[in-house]
Amino acid sequence: MLKTITAFLVTLIVASSAWAIDGAQLLIQVDRNLNPESYEMYRKLINVEPDGSKKEYTLFSVKKGQDKIAALFLAPASEKGRSTLRLGDNMWLYIPNVGKPIRITSLQSVVGGVFNNADILSLDYSAEYNVEKADESGKEHLLFLKAKTREVAYDRLKMWIDKSKSLPTKIECLTEANMLIKTLYFKDMKDFGGGLTRPSVIETDSPLYKGYKSIMIFARIKKKDFKDEIFTLTFMPNMESLRK
């Protein structure tokens, strides 16, 4: 009887380990299906007010590896030339003619609206989160993610993933106590070329900002390698040169 119980427990442990490994591998696959590890990107951010009024921003972004990303504001004219840089958990904002780049935090937002700096300068999910649990939900996988450090913007994520595409359809961003902060909706599949087909639109809303909505529209994503020197404070004023 004892041998039977022991064998059963071993089976459970092995099965649990298999789930964890599968979940971790799936999360890495989701990262690569969303973006190449290093890329250049053009996108538009739209903030929608409760009265329907909108404010739009156009950004050019570059990323290298799992923890380096920078973005340059192209529009509106009032923001043109501003740039942001993220190295791991550290973020900076450069404003032309103001001086040195200033530190910003992940929960602030350089554009206002529901998207915060962590959303705008997003890293690979697998770089910031561990998979606590993996479930099935009809035609979707459901991953329960836990932040690796306290510096990550959201302590927990619930990620619904299309089984056929290994791409997210919805992500709930939660506090440690599982209070909902915001929900991300992934929409409108698009072929970006180079073997990359992914949602071209991410919409977000939040119970903390009732009536507000923010939308991220991806126009171009292209695999491209960059030198490390691009992801430095001294290069922030020169990001426009990457577009030439």
Report residues per predicted region.
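N-terminal, post-signal-peptide region of Sec/Tat-exported proteins
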Residues: 42-78
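Positively charged n-region of N-terminal signal peptides that target proteins for export
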Residues: 1-5
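Bacterial N-terminal signal peptides
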Residues: 7-16
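Structural motif
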Residues: 67-68, 90-91, 165-167
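Broad, structure-driven detector of short, well-ordered beta-strand segments within folded domains
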Residues: 60-62, 82-86, 157-159, 216
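Flexible, processing/modification-adjacent segments and terminal tails
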Residues: 21-38, 44-46, 53-55, 79-155, ...
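Gly/Pro-enriched, hydrophobic low-complexity segments
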Residues: 138-233
